[in-house]
Amino acid sequence: MKKCVLLGVLLLFLTGCGSQETFETVADVLDAPAAPQPRQILVDLPGEEGQEVLETPAGQLYLSEDYEIGVEVLSSGDLDATLKTLCGRKREELTVMETAADGVKRYEFVWAAAGENGDQLGRGMVLDDGNYHYCLTVQRPAEGTGDTQIVWSQVFSSFSLA
């Protein structure tokens, strides 16, 4: 009888030692991965010492008598929404050139607009690393564009991510 009781107690203890499988259910709250921090933007701006800088939640706006330069970081995913934010136009209304290097997509575009002080030309670039849109825009008067073209080419060619 003692053997049977001892065997029964051992069986009772051993049944509680088995590993239980955990199953995911619809009601489970899964941890969403945290979005990585935005990368640092590198760009060479002309004449930085005389510019007025306005801080926005998304980036900086550099103001000069001849031009405005915007450097912003926006959420990635919807390029149309980013273009609408930057220049007020949808992708279908613009000619957007797309290239890629080092896992980063690069979108370049230009636009023209009537401003308060006459016609304006705008040029923009968006770098998309899959998490964020890193944006550079320049808007300047349409008059007298020949002498500043080299300067703007240097600004856009220097735009990169660290």
Q: Regions from the language model: what does each represent?
A:
Residues C4, G8-L10, A101-R106:
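N-terminal targeting leader peptides, primarily classical Sec-type signal peptides for secretion
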Residues V5-G8, F13-Q60, S64-Y67, D129-Y132, ...:
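N-terminal targeting sequences that direct proteins away from the cytosol to non-cytosolic compartments
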Residues R39-E55, K84-K90, A112-G118:
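Short, solvent-exposed secondary-structure boundary motifs
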Residues G59-T85:
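A short acidic-to-branched-hydrophobic micro-motif
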Residues E68, S76-L79, G115-E116, P141-G144:
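Solvent-exposed loop/turn segments at secondary-structure junctions
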Residues V73, T137-V138:
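Residue-level recognition of conserved beta-strand positions in structured domain cores
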Residues C87-N131:
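Signature of long, low-cysteine stretches enriched in small and polar/charged residues
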